[in-house]
C-alpha cells in the first residue's frame, strides 16, 4: 500500500496494490450506457451511499462499442463535502453502447466503510457517527479473533490467477507465502522480504541455480523482477514432476480458447 501505480491507468484492476482485506478486490462496478444522441448514463453496481458518478464530461464518439475504453481517460474522485464523494468520468464513450467494468475509483478505506455500512444497515443496524470515521491502525498484540473465513482451495485460486493473469492475486499469493514463513523469519523482516527469502529457499532445495533471479512483488507488473530462461525452464520442469502438477496445468490458459490467450494464436498449430 502506498506504492505508485505501474502506469498512467491506475483505475484498472491490474494496478490494484493488494492489502490483507482486499474487500471486493478494492474495486467498484461501473455501468455505462448511451443512445445515439443525448447524455451518457453512468451508475455504480451496487450503488454506494454518499458516492455519485458524474458522466457529463464524457463525449459521445463513433468508436466501436467493443473498444469503448479506447477514448477513456482516468476518472477523478473528490470529496465534495464531508462523507460525500463524486467520481467524474472523462474522455469519450461510443454511441449506442452498453459496458460494465470493475474499476479502482475510490480509496480502499472509503469503499470498505461504505460496504460495511450498507451491510450493517440491511441487518437493521445503525451507526452513531457520520461517514468518514474509518481509522487506520496496527492490530494490537492482544486482539481477539471474532470470526474467520477460509479461502477457496489453492488449486481454485491458482486457476483464476493464471488464466486471467490476475496481478493483485499473484502479489497476494506471494505475501501469503511470506506470512506463513514469518515465524521462521529474522526479527524485523517484513512479510514481503520473508516471501522473497522463501522463494529463494525453494530454488535452493530443488538445486536450481538462481543466479540473476530477482523476486520483486511476484507479478508481471514489475520493473525489476528477473529470471533467466534456463532457470525458468528448470523451475517448470521441477513443477511438472511435482505433486501439484495437475493444479498448475489446469491453471494455464489454453491458446485461442480462454483466459488471456483467448484471442491469441488462433488458427495456428498452438
What does each model-identified segment do?
Residues 62-246:
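A small/polar active-site loop signature that marks catalytic segments
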Residues 30, 144, 170, 260-261:
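Secretory-pathway/luminal and periplasmic proteins that interact with or process carbohydrate-rich
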Residues 42, 53, 70-79, 270:
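Generic structural motif
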Residues 225, 249-250, 258:
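C-terminal structured domain segments across diverse proteins
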Residues 205-212, 254-270:
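Active-site Gly/Thr loop motif
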Residues 1-64:
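Polar, glycine-rich mid-to-C-terminal structural blocks
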Amino acid at each position: 500500500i502506498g506504492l505508485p501505480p505501474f502506469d498512467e491507468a491506475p483505475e484498472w484492476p491490474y494496478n490494484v496494490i493488494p492489502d490483507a482485506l482486499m474487500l471486493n478486490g478494492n474495486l467498484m462496478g461501473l455501468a455505462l450506457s448511451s443512445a445515439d444522441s443525448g447524455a451518457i448514463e453512468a451508475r455504480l453496481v451496487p450503488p454506494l451511499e454518499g458516492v455519485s458518478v458524474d458522466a457529463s464530461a464524457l463525449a459521445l464518439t463513433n468508436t466501436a462499442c467493443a473498444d469503448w475504453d479506447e477514448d477513456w481517460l482516468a476518472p477523478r474522485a473528490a470529496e465534495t463535502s464531508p462523507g460525500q464523494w463524486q467520481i467524474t468520468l472523462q474522455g469519450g464513450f461510443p454511441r449506442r453502447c452498453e459496458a460494465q467494468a470493475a474499476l479502482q475509483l475510490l480509496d480502499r478505506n472509503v469503499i470498505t466503510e461504505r460496504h460495511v455500512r450498507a451491510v450493517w444497515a440491511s441487518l437493521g443496524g445503525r451507526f452513531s457517527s457520520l461517514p468518514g470515521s474509518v481509522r487506520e491502525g496496527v492490530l494490537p498484540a492482544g486482539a481477539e479473533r471474532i470470526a474467520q473465513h477460509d479461502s477457496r482451495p489453492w488449486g481454485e485460486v491458482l486457476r483464476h490467477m493464471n488464466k486471467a493473469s490476475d496481478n493483485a492475486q499473484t502479489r497476494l499469493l506471494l505475501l501469503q507465502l511470506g506470512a506463513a514463513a514469518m515465524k521462521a523469519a529474522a526479527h524485523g523482516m517484513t512479510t514481503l522480504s520473508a516471501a522473497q527469502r522463501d522463494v529463494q529457499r525453494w530454488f535452493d532445495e530443488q538445486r536450481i541455480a538462481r543466479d540473476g533471479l530477482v523476486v520483486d512483488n511476484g507479478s508481471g507488473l514489475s520493473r525489476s523482477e528477473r529470471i533467466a530462461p534456463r532457470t525458468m525452464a528448470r523451475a517448470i520442469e521441477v513443477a511438472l514432476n511435482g505433486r501439484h502438477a495437475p493444479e498448475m496445468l489446469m491453471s494455464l490458459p489454453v491458446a485461442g480458447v480462454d483466459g488471456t490467450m483467448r484471442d491469441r494464436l488462433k488458427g495456428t498449430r498452438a
